[in-house]
Amino acid sequence: MSGEVLSQNEIDALLSAISTGEMDAEELKKEEKEKKVKVYDFKRALRFSKDQIRSLTRIHDNFARLLTTHFSAQLRTYIHISVSSVDQVPYEEFIRSIPNMTILNLFDVHPMEGRIMMEVNPTIAYTMMDRVMGGIGISHNKVDSLTEIETKIISNLFENALGNYKEAWQSIADIEPEMTEFEVNPQFVQMVSPNETVVVISLNTQIGEISGVINLCIPHIVLEPLIPKLSVHYWMQSDRNEPKPEETKSLEKRIMTAQIPVVAELGTSELTIEEFLSLEVGDCITLDKSVTDPLTVLVGDKPKFLGQAGRVNRKQAVQILDHDIRGEQDGE
């Protein structure tokens, strides 16, 4: 029998059919013993193991994080990109699944053979372009009538992001992505034969209230030389290796540009619940510091410096006077 669970009505109907002779119990047993034949679709031949798909997911999770940081900085707004699915399908099926008119970026990945296609939902592409041109991120889906300037802006946006793809693959292979073609009609692009297996990585992309999908289509021929490295065993070995100097330098560069909150604290005070509930506009709260005491400057939530309040160019400011001993004692 299959793994399906019958309802009570179905069980009653089955017992009734057996008891009345409408169904032969021996015949059911015979069918159960017979070998089941599973239909195999040669057009959907699975050429990547689950282990290899997991490795590709891990690589592109990293790529999604890098893209999030890259585009957030480029467009000066918060963007969230994440992997939603990783599938292997025939190339023809992938082409049928995307819009008739869309944004297609094709790039080589030297030294591997073949090309990778990045399909960007027009809604996402136009929202990005609007942000680059100083807008608030409004999408106008008119991909069939892209001007030469619009084409250049969109292609440059994604060409500049290819460095992140190189970085995402660093633990597996040293690749050099290079944009080679920009197209809007999928029917004009023939990377591989229709039945060739491709891996499709779908990236959910959120820009403010606008959402869409970026698809990466990677033919089997591109990944074939790397298949031995797409395994958990290889990942475990590479994780134990010492980081490469360029990886350390890249990490240091990203840390140096990270932003952390800095707060100049005037002072603190303690109130009873009764006092807190009775606070009104105009009430004064006495702090624990004298007007001549230096301010505590917090980096993150740790005291790091002592400072003096002042003004610079009509804005409030704080001048660093000394290190805060408390922060040094804590080893911060």
UniProtKB/Swiss-Prot annotation:
Cellular compartment(s): Cell membrane; Bacterial flagellum basal body
InterPro entries: CheC-like_sf, Flag_FliM, FliN-like_C, SpoA-like_sf
Protein's membrane topology: Peripheral membrane protein
Biological processes per GO annotation: bacterial-type flagellum assembly; bacterial-type flagellum-dependent swarming motility; positive chemotaxis
SUPFAM superfamilies (alphabetical): CheC-like (SSF103039), Surface presentation of antigens (SPOA) (SSF101801)
Protein purpose: One of the proteins that forms a switch complex that is proposed to be located at the base of the basal body. This complex interacts with chemotaxis proteins (such as CheY) in addition to contacting components of the motor that determine the direction of flagellar rotation.
NCBIfam families: fliM_switch
Family from the record: Belongs to the FliM family.
Name of protein: Flagellar motor switch protein FliM
